[in-house]
């Protein structure tokens, strides 16, 4: 499955083009971004898709030199347990 980038989101579509996973973020000011929500279809649960989506946002925000506020409960959980994200968390 390919993770694609859209406007303020990363997402995955199924073979029919239906979106089956997404993470939405909002750039705020010059150096912040907020992860608003993550949604993964039930058929993909337990496959690490949510983690991959969070990692994509982290990668993009590091390139843009932005810190992240993980408001989404799933993203917050990932930030809490992934020490490699400490440097980018606001």
UniProtKB/Swiss-Prot annotation:
A Pfam match: Acetyltransf_CG
Quote the PROSITE patterns the UniProt record gives: GNAT_YJDJ (PS51729)
Select a single GO molecular function from the record's annotations and give it. Answer: acyltransferase activity, transferring groups other than amino-acyl groups
Q: Where is the N-acetyltransferase domain?
A: 2-90
Name of protein? Uncharacterized protein YjdJ
Q: Taxonomic classification, please?
A: Bacteria, Pseudomonadati, Pseudomonadota, Gammaproteobacteria, Enterobacterales
